[in-house]
């Protein structure tokens, strides 16, 4: 086969779509594909060489993607590589229009998709062009200013593209050099760098190249990940990178040292709730890991010699198992379910890759690390428990069903039996339908694994019959969801099983195994099953007839639910009959025939269901079925219509309708079998098509449609699970061997129905007989020669439409001359013709054209004479749509079938073995879909005059009087616009005519219709926004001008809404349109390689030289033209805006359009600049806002480039950089930091300094070339009025004009929305641009305003001056020293004034102002500002509030400077320390936040030297010495608040309490912000916090206690390094000996959270586990009851998450404690008091009982082997003294509550004696005893 094909093709295809070989016309496809490929290669290569990106290259790349959909990668490897290289060149053309770039990128992704087809040797692509493209779009410097408009989808397209590219082996090192310098953890660049590493770093390399691959970065990244504790945003990216690395290099990366840490972090990432009251750090929720990558990572680490990951995975699942129980719910549940669903799928994928996949160039997994059978078993065992619980989850059973499907593929014997155990009882129960739906949906997924049985699970198939029989009661008319899942269940199982009675084989054959004999005898029940199923269906139908389910008045259509049941019923019944043997089929046929013919059904609901069942029967075996049905129905109909009057009756007899309906459905069968009955059928059609009754003739039309369709279409006729059916005798073929057998793609033996000559003749005979006369009548009517009533017209149209639908596949498409002159192109833009199995007969009349002609005449006649006949218009619109697009199937039907095909495929596929092992019916369906796809592919159709006429008719209908007609016509129009090449250019001007203001004859309906035509629908073309200058230049000005049209009225809300939607859609969908269409030489060269390639030889060769010259000339002309069109569009819009009569709405729309036209590669024309600058002072706020944004963008366009030069950091610092990596504060980057003794205070210092503006340079490592700005002498001079361009002069004139500025400042200091306004970055950009481009030219005019504003303390004025100042400081980046000095001399006093007026409304704006001003600026440039801010944050002059605000502002500035101002941070800290004992809460909170930022730089990251900024350790020591009085004292710490004017120095203790309150604020603030947690320092404070924190959850506590509790909660959730755990445990042990029981109680709650959040890290050290265990057991014997109970709860939790095991030593310890003897109670006097202190013995005895109780409660959902004995032990204490009795009762009632659901299962674990005792215990004691 392959050889012959290679001979025809001339090459070996890379990978083609196999389904094409099964089409009935497969033998023609090789030649066809070669023709198309030669066409694509010739034209694409030619278009590239002629440099015609649009339409040439775009048109032919689209054809290439269509080719991929039709044939797969059916080209030689050489062509494949050429296509990829060419597209890569095209994608990376700089300045390429974004929509073209996306279209090329999507195709490129498709070509790169199957990695195994091209190895590294075949193809390497450079990574830098892609990186430049990605950077320019995702981190665009101009997008935020509105100079570039990118679509939302572009990010994902580019990411996918980057992931699919192969890069050379040297790339890893180059990438590290490029992005390492960005790794500054305090900066946003960190996120960017790690994001780039995740996307770009290559991980698929052969092992010998690993040294040039991941080994270069693995340790560095891994150490970074391990050392970060507080989940910054980029941690997730690292996880994604590691997951990809693990998956691509199984066995080559040693994960073992990291495994406990990895699993601890994964567990933390689920954010599960632990303990009682828990504070959640918000970033833990937003930055948590992506489950898909977590799953990939876990599944790649399993296996290997130790298989450590499996042990941890067991731990992970046992620790979270109870969260899967259906009674638990929360926002974490979705994540856990995703984990459950994806993990088995990922393991299956890995097994497939290791065991079944064809080897290719990608390195295989080394055999030492492949998953062994034991590994798989262990994995399945670990997942079984959670999956079985999740089956009944609140989120539905889908996730569990998918998990079970994959687990059953690997180990059916482990997972199927427990699910069956749940399924059988669920089928019996009537009260819990939810259980039935859940178990059935899980069984459906496991059906194939159950049936194929295999050596591990041979007893699987025996369950089929019992399951099927018991499922029958589920067909229940009263429970919809149960009914549907039952249908699905039955259909799934019967598709896989031939329903053949094989019991007779027991006597004939003696070579059967035991299992086969059992199946043979069971198969005798099949007949019974089929008949019972039918009875159930009949009952269902009887109860859903119209009379039963509707009131008289209600609708007669089927409801949505009924139509679903109908679908379920008919497809299930059809599946059953397909799989039946002939004997069973005959019985079933008899039964359904009797049911259908002895009753009369109404045709709407019940009738449809019965007819469907009959159709199913006749589809399976047409000959047998038609023999019964056709004569019966025909006789009945002939008999009932014998009377003349019948044809004129309005309401027909029910029996007649029912027989018609039945007949119309049973004829949907193999056309060949219909031919014997053709005379009868034609006779019936002639009788019934002219019935008066609408219901009657509609059914007759259906009959006509189905008869034609059955004979004219190509379709498969059998869907049986085994080719050839089951009719062979049992001696030679035993069907039970085929249970669950997949279809064999290579021997599918599809039986196709291809119309024979006889059938074709019959089709045309029917058309001549029935269609011809209708067309003639309609034509006479349209010419006014014959009267027809509306009903008659409608009836005729109905017949025409159904003839088209039936015979559409035989009628050749409309043809004619092409519409030319729409688009100039030097490349051939022809359409590709696909062969779809029909040879059109040119000798017969082409009815498509005839219908087309008559319909157009009729349409014009109706629109002229009776436009209100909307029903006929609807019919005509439908017919026009079918004339254009219908070749035998509809697009929407195809789409929904494709969807359902993928769903069924998913639910039944075998991902483990792969190789398309689907069931036969599914494969046949897929082949049919391939055929239909070929029929429906209409991309790139030529636009012919016929189409032009039809489109114009549709446009006329789209702008007609009635809204329903308009909307139906518009939908057809939009589909057509997307089908024909360039037809939009022809139609758009016609639509715009309706909007022309000069026309007075346009009605409102036409106006609205035209607007809707421009708007488009949500998925089609939007005419108002085609990405093309010609179209936009027409539509945008027309939309604006339509505001002057007489038909436009703003009183009509519908019209106003339309304009809003239009403007909104244009804004949403606009993408910057290209101006520069240059094609680079590399691409041209590749184009030549394509036209010169062979196999297949391109059908046209390389263009001649003169053509190439012409191409170059055309390209240059095109670029010029684009610029002219752009300028003209701007000019047109400005002209519209000049019109005084234009309503305000349209003015705003026009300005909106103008603002979309700003670009970064071509300056805005001067008149538009003038317009926007003037609009800054427009009356309308909306316009002012648009103008501010636009002017900021214009200033960016006018920005003059600055010269940069490379410098060598070592020359400046005088230090040579060390060989290995050293990050952080080191001698080599000391010169970047702020040193107050060497600041640039004079002109020469300023010029000598090397300023580095960006904060991240130099922290981690230096870039290869550090670029800094050249000295001032080499930079361009400041702008002088005589050297300005026109645009610059316009801005200059306005901003030096005092009246303009006056007005502007007035507007800018108005408030917009009270209390909602914030510092506005747009305005900041405006001022920054002004001062950057014109240096200090505008200061003189602005100064007086700024001084005035700064003195006014109103919110909006302060905000305005803050925006100006921020812009001014950032804009002064390149000013000369003199100007800068003068600037600060003016600004410093001004800011002092402003900051002294600070208020609660404005402090945030001032913070933003300073932060913005300091962002990306060298601190040595800003020393004036920083020193001013440092002066007086806590002077106390303005009261506590002003102090807090000053601190906030200062913090904004210093935080932006990160690690470069250690000196200032030290100064600030020494300044704050004495003031930490603040009284006011707001100041304390602010100080806490500032401290966080001061210590932020003190991080413990790998390769990082200790910082010069303040260290936490030293600070904590100083604090602790001041807190001594609190730590040493024993009395309770109260919140002392002393009056302000308290005399004298307060005592040490009060000072300490005030200090502590501030320290708590600092601890809380830093929990979510810093990178690493200072654990050793926190531990020193722990004892103090435990002392204060209250036990109950009560909000009435004072601030100090609440804060202490919060701090404990946050600390306990912290991630600990392994070496820190023993330190924490030591402190907890110490506190457990404290005298305060509150502290001892809190130790337990702290321990719960800490252990769970560091589970695997603690488990990896035996010593720590023992430490925790000892601590809990010690506190179980605490003298305080509350502490004992909490210890029991904690122990139970640890047992439940498998942190501690229930071993014999623990059990004996508790049993011993329980036996502690209690002292005898002495007889007392009645009046005396009991002793309140419990005796030591009682405590010990209680501890033992609590221990047992904890063990019992730790297994809430199952009964382990040790449980019964413990329950017996416990019951002995039921009558002990309190508190023991109470504990026992509580435990027993909890046990009863949690085990009640599955008590039947759990009962099995107990002996009879134990059950007797237990029943006594659990039944409430009798109250009358």
Swiss-Prot record:
Signal peptide: none
HEAT repeat extents: 458-502, 981-1020, 1162-1200, 1336-1374, 1618-1656, 1662-1700
Cross-referenced InterPro entries: ARM-like, ARM-type_fold, Blm10_mid, HEAT_PSME4, PSME4, PSME4_C
A GO biological process held by the record: DNA repair
Entry GO terms, CC: cytosol; nuclear speck; nucleus; spermatoproteasome complex
Pfam families: HEAT_PSME4 (PF23096), HEAT_PSME4_mid (PF16507), PSME4_C (PF11919)
GO molecular function annotations of the record: lysine-acetylated histone binding; peptidase activator activity; proteasome binding
Residue numbers spanned by region Bromodomain-like (BRDL): 1632-1720
Source species, domain of life: Eukaryota
Subcellular localization, as worded in the UniProt entry: Cytoplasm, Cytosol; Nucleus; Nucleus speckle
Keywords: Cytoplasm, DNA damage, DNA repair, Nucleus, Proteasome, Repeat
Keyword Transcription regulation: no
Disulfide bonding pattern of the chain: none
Function: Associated component of the proteasome that specifically recognizes acetylated histones and promotes ATP- and ubiquitin-independent degradation of core histones during DNA damage response. Recognizes and binds acetylated histones via its bromodomain-like (BRDL) region and activates the proteasome by opening the gated channel for substrate entry. Binds to the core proteasome via its C-terminus, which occupies the same binding sites as the proteasomal ATPases, opening the closed structure of the proteasome via an active gating mechanism.
Domain notes: The bromodomain-like (BRDL) region specifically recognizes and binds acetylated histones.
Subunit-level organization: Homodimer. Interacts with the 20S and 26S proteasomes.
Family of the protein in this entry: Belongs to the BLM10 family.
Protein name per the record: Proteasome activator complex subunit 4B
Gene name per UniProt: psme4b
């Amino acid at each position: 086969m392959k050889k012959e094909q290679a001979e025809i093709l001339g090459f070996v295809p890379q990978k083609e779509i196999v389904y094409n070989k099964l089409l009935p016309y497969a033998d023609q496809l090789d030649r066809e594909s070669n023709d198309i490929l030669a066409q694509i290669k010739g034209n694409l290569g030619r278009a590239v060489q002629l440099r015609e990106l649009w339409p040439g290259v775009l048109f032919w790349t689209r054809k290439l993607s269509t080719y991929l959909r039709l044939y797969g990668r059916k080209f030689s490897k050489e062509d494949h590589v050429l296509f990829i290289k060419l597209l890569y060149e095209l994608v990376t053309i700089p300045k390429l229009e974004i929509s073209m770039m996306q279209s090329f990128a999507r195709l490129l992704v498709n070509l790169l998709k199957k990695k195994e087809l091209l190895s590294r040797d075949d193809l390497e692509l450079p990574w830098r062009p892609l990186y430049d493209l990605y950077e320019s779009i995702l981190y665009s410097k101009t997008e935020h200013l509105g100079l570039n408009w990118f679509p939302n989808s572009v990010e994902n397209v580019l990411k996918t593209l980057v992931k699919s590219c192969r890069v050379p082996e040297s790339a890893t090192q180059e990438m590290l050099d490029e992005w390492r310098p960005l790794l500054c953890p305090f900066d946003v660049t960190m996120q960017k760098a790690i994001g780039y590493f995740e996307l770009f770093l290559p991980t698929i390399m052969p092992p010998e190249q690993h040294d040039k691959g991941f080994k270069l970065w693995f340790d560095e990244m891994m150490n970074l990940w391990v050392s970060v504790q507080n989940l910054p945003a980029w941690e997730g990216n690292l996880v994604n990178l590691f997951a990809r690395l693990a998956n691509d290099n199984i066995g080559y990366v040693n994960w073992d040292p990291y495994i406990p840490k990895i699993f601890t972090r994964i567990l933390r990432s689920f954010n599960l709730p632990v303990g009682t009251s828990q504070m959640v750090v918000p970033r833990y929720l937003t930055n948590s890991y992506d489950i898909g990558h977590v799953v990939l990572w876990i599944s790649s680490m399993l296996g290997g010699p130790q298989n450590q990951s499996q042990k941890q995975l067991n731990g992970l699942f046992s620790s979270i198992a109870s969260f899967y129980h259906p009674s638990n719910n929360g926002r974490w549940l979705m994540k856990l379910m995703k984990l459950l669903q994806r993990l088995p799928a990922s393991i299956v994928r890995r097994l497939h890759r290791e065991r079944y996949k064809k080897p290719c160039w990608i390195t295989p997994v080394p055999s030492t690390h492949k998953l062994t059978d034991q590994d798989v078993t262990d994995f399945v065992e670990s997942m079984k428990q959670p999956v079985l619980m999740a089956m009944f989850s609140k989120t539905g059973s889908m996730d569990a069903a998918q998990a079970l499907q994959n687990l059953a593929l690997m180990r059916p014997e482990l997972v199927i039996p427990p699910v069956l155990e749940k399924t059988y009882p669920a089928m019996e129960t009537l009260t819990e339908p939810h259980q039935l739906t859940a178990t059935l949906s899980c069984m459906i997924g496991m059906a194939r694994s159950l049936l194929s049985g295999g050596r591990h699970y041979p007893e699987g198939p025996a369950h089929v019959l019992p399951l099927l029989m018991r499922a029958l009661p589920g067909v229940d008319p009263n429970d919809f969801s149960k009914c549907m899942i039952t249908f699905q269940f039955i259909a799934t199982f019967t598709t896989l099983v031939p329903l053949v009675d094989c019991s007779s084989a027991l006597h004939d054959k003696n070579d059967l195994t035991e299992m086969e004999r059992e199946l043979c005898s069971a198969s005798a029940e099949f007949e019974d099953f089929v008949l019972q199923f039918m009875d159930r269906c009949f009952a269902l139908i009887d109860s859903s007839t119209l009379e039963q389910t509707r009131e008289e008045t209600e609708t007669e259509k089927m409801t949505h639910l009924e139509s679903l049941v109908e679908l379920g019923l008919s497809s299930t019944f059809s599946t059953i009959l397909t799989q039946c043997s002939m004997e069973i089929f005959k019985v079933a046929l008899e039964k359904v025939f009797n049911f259908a013919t002895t009753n009369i059904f109404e045709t709407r609901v019940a009738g449809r269901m019965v007819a469907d069942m009959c159709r199913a029967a006749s589809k399976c075996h047409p000959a047998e079925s038609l023999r019964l049905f056709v004569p019966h129905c025909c006789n009945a109909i002939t008999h009932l219509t014998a009377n003349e009057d019948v044809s004129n009756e309005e309401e027909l007899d029910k029996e007649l309708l029912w027989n018609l309906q039945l007949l119309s459905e049973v004829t949907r069968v193999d056309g060949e079998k219909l031919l014997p009955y053709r005379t009868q059928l034609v006779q019936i059609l002639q009788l019934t098509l002219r019935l008066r009754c609408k219901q009657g003739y509609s059914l007759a039309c259906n009959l006509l449609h189905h008869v034609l369709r059955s004979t004219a279409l190509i379709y498969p006729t059998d869907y049986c699970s085994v080719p050839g059916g089951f009719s062979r005798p049992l001696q030679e073929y035993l069907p039970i061997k085929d249970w669950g057998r997949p279809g064999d793609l290579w021997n599918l033996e599809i039986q196709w129905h291809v119309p024979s000559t006889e059938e074709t003749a019959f089709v045309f005979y029917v058309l001549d007989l029935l269609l011809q006369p209708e067309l003639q009548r309609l034509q006479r009517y349209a010419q006014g020669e014959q009267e027809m009533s509306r009903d008659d017209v409608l009836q005729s149209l109905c017949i025409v439409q159904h003839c088209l639908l039936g015979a559409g596949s035989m009628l050749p498409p409309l043809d004619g001359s092409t519409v030319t002159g729409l688009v100039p192109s030097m490349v051939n833009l022809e359409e590709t013709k696909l062969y779809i199995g029909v040879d059109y007969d040119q000798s017969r009349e082409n009815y498509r054209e005839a219908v087309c002609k008559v319909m157009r005449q009729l349409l014009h006649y109706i629109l002229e004479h009776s436009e209100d006949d909307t029903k006929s218009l609807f019919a005509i619109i439908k017919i026009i749509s079918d004339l254009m697009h219908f070749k035998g199937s509809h697009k929407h039907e195809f789409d929904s079938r494709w969807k359902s095909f993928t769903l069924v495929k998913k639910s039944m596929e075998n991902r483990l073995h792969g190789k398309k092992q689907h069931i036969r019916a599914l494969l046949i369906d897929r082949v049919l879909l391939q055929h239909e796809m070929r029929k429906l592919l209409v991309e790139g159709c030529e636009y012919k005059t016929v189409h032009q006429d039809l489109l114009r008719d549709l446009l006329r209908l789209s702008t007609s009087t009635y809204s329903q007609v308009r909307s139906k016509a518009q939908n057809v129009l939009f589909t057509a616009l997307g089908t024909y090449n360039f037809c939009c250019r022809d139609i758009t001007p016609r639509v715009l005519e309706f909007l022309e203001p000069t026309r007075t004859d346009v009605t409102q309906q036409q106006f609205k219709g035209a607007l809707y035509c421009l708007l488009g629908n949500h998925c089609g073309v939007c005419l108002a926004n085609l990405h093309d200058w010609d179209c936009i230049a027409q539509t945008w000005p027309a939309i604006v001008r339509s505001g002057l049209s007489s038909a436009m009225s703003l009183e009509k809300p519908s019209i106003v809404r339309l304009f809003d939607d239009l403007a909104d859609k244009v804004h949403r969908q606009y993408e910057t349109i290209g101006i520069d269409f240059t094609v680079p030489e590399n691409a041209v060269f590749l184009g030549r390689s394509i036209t010169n390639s062979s196999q297949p030889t391109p059908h046209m060769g390389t263009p001649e030289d003169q053509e190439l010259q012409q191409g170059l000339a055309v390209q240059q002309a095109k670029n010029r033209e684009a610029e002219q069109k752009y300028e003209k569009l701007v000019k047109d819009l400005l002209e519209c805006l000049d019109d005084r009569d234009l309503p305000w709405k349209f003015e705003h729309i026009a300005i909106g359009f103008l603002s979309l036209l700003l670009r970064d590669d071509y300056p805005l024309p001067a008149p538009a600049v003038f317009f926007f600058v003037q609009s800054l002072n427009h009356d309308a706020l909306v316009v002012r806002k648009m103008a501010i944004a636009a002017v900021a963008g214009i200033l960016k366009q006018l920005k003059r480039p600055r010269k940069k030069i490379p410098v060598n950091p070592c020359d400046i610092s005088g230090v040579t950089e060390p060989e290995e990596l050293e990050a952080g504060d080191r001698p080599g980057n000391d010169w970047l930091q702020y040193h107050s003794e060497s600041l640039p205070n004079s002109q020469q210092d300023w010029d000598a300094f090397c300023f580095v503006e960006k904060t991240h340079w130099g922290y981690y490592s230096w870039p290869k070339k550090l670029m800094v700005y050249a000295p001032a002498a080499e930079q361009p001079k400041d702008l002088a009025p005589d050297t300005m361009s026109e645009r610059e002069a316009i801005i200059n004139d306005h901003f030096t004009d005092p009246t303009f500025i006056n007005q502007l400042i007035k507007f800018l200091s108005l408030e917009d929305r009270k209390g909602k306004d914030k510092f506005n970055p747009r305005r900041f950009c405006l001022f920054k641009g002004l001062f950057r481009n014109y240096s200090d030219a505008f200061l003189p005019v602005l100064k007086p305003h700024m001084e005035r504003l700064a003195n006014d303390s109103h919110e909006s004025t302060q905000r305005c001056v803050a925006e100006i100042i921020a812009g001014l400081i950032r804009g002064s980046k390149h000013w000369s020293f003199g100007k800068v000095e003068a600037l600060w001399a003016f600004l410093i006093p001004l800011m002092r004034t402003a900051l002294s007026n600070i208020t609660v409304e404005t402090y945030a704006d001032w913070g933003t102002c300073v932060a913005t001003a300091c962002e990306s600026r060298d601190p040595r440039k800003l020393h004036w500002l920083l020193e001013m801010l440092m002066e007086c944050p806590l002077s106390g002059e303005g009261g506590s509030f002003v102090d807090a605000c000053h601190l906030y502002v200062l913090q904004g500035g210093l935080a932006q400077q990160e690690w470069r101002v250690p000196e200032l941070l030290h100064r600030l800290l020494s300044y704050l320390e004495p003031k930490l004992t603040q009284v006011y809460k707001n100041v304390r909170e602010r100080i806490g936040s500032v401290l966080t930022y001061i210590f932020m730089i003190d991080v413990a990251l790998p390769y990082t030297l200790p910082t010069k900024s303040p260290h936490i350790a030293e600070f904590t020591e100083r604090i602790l010495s001041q807190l001594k009085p609190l730590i040493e004292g024993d009395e309770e710490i109260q919140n002392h608040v002393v009056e302000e004017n308290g005399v004298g120095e307060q005592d040490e203790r009060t000072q300490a309490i005030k200090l502590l309150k501030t320290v708590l604020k600092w601890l809380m603030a830093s929990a979510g912000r810093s990178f690493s947690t200072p654990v050793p320092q926190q531990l020193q404070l722990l004892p103090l916090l435990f002392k204060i924190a209250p036990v109950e959850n009560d909000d009435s506590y004072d601030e100090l206690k609440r804060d202490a509790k919060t701090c404990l909660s946050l600390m306990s959730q912290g991630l600990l390094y392994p070496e820190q755990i023993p330190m924490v445990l030591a402190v907890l042990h110490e506190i457990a000996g404290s005298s305060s029981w509150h502290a001892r109680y809190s130790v337990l709650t702290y321990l719960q959270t800490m252990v769970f959040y560091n589970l695997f890290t603690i488990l990896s050290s035996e010593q720590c586990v023992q430490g925790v265990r000892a601590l809990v057991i010690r506190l179980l014997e605490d003298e305080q009851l509350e502490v004992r109970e909490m210890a029991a709860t904690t122990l139970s939790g640890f047992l439940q998450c498998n942190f501690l095991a229930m071993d014999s030593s623990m059990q004996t310890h508790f049993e011993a404690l329980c036996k502690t003897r209690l002292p005898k109670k002495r007889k007392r006097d009645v009046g005396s008091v009991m002793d309140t202190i419990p005796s030591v013995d009682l405590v010990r005895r209680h501890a033992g009982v609590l221990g047992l109780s904890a063990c019992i409660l730790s297994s809430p959902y199952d009964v382990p082997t040790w449980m019964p004995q413990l329950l017996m032990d416990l019951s002995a204490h039921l009558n002990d003294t309190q508190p023991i009795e109470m504990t026992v009762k509580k435990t027993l009632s909890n046990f009863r509550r949690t085990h009640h659901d599955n008590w039947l299962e759990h009962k099995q674990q107990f002996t009879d004696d134990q059950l007797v005792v237990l029943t006594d215990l659990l039944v409430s004691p009798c109250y009358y005893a």
